From Swiss-Prot:
HAMAP family: PSII_PsbA_D1. The chain crosses the membrane at residues 29-46, 118-133, 142-156, 197-218, 274-288. It comes from the Bacteria. Pfam families: Photo_RC. The record marks 344-345 as: Cleavage. It comes from Nostoc sp. (strain PCC 7120 / SAG 25.82 / UTEX 2576). The D1/D2 heterodimer binds P680, chlorophylls that are the primary electron donor of PSII, and subsequent electron acceptors. It shares a non-heme iron and each subunit binds pheophytin, quinone, additional chlorophylls, carotenoids and lipids. D1 provides most of the ligands for the Mn4-Ca-O5 cluster of the oxygen-evolving complex (OEC). There is also a Cl(-1) ion associated with D1 and D2, which is required for oxygen evolution. The PSII complex binds additional chlorophylls, carotenoids and specific lipids. The keyword Repeat does not apply. The gene is psbA5. This is Photosystem II protein D1 3.
Amino acid sequence: MTTLLEQRSSANLWHRFGNWITSTENRMYVGWFGVLLIPTALTAAIVFILAFIAAPPVDVDGIREPVSGSLLYGNNIITATVVPTSAAIGLHLYPIWEAASLDEWLYNGGPYQMIVLHFLIAIYAYMGRQWELSYRLGMRPWIPVAFSAPVAAATAVLLIYPIGQGSFSDGMMLGISGTFNFMIVFSPEHNILMHPFHMIGVAGVFGGALFSAMHGSLVTSTLVRETSEVESANTGYKFGQEEETYNIVAAHGYFGRLIFQYASFNNSRSLHFFLAAWPVIGIWFAALGISTMSFNLNGFNFNNSILDHQGRTIDTWADLLNRANLGIEVMHERNAHNFPLDLASGEVQPIALTAPAIAS
C-alpha cells in the first residue's frame, strides 16, 4: 500500500511538472526544448565570459606558439577573442577530464570546444522551442523555419567547416576581430567571392535589408487619413499608438507609380511572405556555400589569363582577385617558414603537459 501511494505521488508530481513546463499561461514559455536550452545556453555563456576575460594563451597551431586572446592577456574589447581549440587536438572531443590537468586543457583551447558545442545545442533547442510554442498556440511553423537560417549559418562556420578542414582550430574565433579574421582568411583559401552560393547569400542579406527598410518606411508613411485637406495628416496620431493606421491600398498605389504597377504587392500575406523568404533563402544558400567550401569545393578560379595577340596578359577581375588572395594567404601563414623543432630534430623532445609560465 505504501509503495502504491509513493508511485502515485511521484506520478502526480511529474504530471504537474509537465503541465507547468508546457503551459502557455506562464510569463515565459519553457517547454520541453527549454529544459535542454537553459543549461546549455547558460554553460556556453558563462564559459564564454570567463574565457573572453581571463583565458590564458592557446597553442592554436599546435606548434608551441601560444596566441593570447583574452582581455587580461593584453587585448582590448575589439581584439579579444576565444581562441579555437589547438590543431594538436584536431577533431577529437576534448572535455576537461580528457586533459591531464586544467592548465593543459586551457593551453590546448578546451573552452572553445565547450562553448561551441553547448551553444549549438542551445540554438537547436531554441528553434525547437519556437516550434513547440507555435504548436501549442495553434500557429503555423514558419517562425522556426525562418530561424533555421541563422542556425544553419552558425552550424556551418562553427561545426561543418572544422569537420571539413580536419580540426577545430579552423573554426571561427569567438570575438569581433576574430570574426573578421575568419572572413578575410576564408576568401583566399576558398575563393569565396567567386562562389555562386555566396553571391546568392549577399543578395539575400542586402536585399532583405533593403526590402525591410522600404516596407517600414511605406508603413510609416501611408496613413489612414482622419483629417481634412487643410489639416496635417499627422494630426491626432502619436508614435507607438495601438490603432492601426496602415493603408495597403495607398502603399500599393504609391509604389506602383514610383516604379511600375506590378512591382508592388496588393496582398499583405504575400508581401510578408516575400519579406521573410528572401533573406532566409539567401542565408540558407550562404550556409550551404560555407559547407561545400569546407570540403574544398571552392569558388570558380579562372587561372588562365587573357592574352593579346603579342602574348601579353590582359588583366581581368579574376587576375586581380587571385593576386589579392595570394597576398592575404602569405600574410596569414605566419609560421610557414618555421618547421616545428620537435619534428625536425633527431632527438625525442619531451612533451609539456602543463602550460608554460607567461612572462608579465
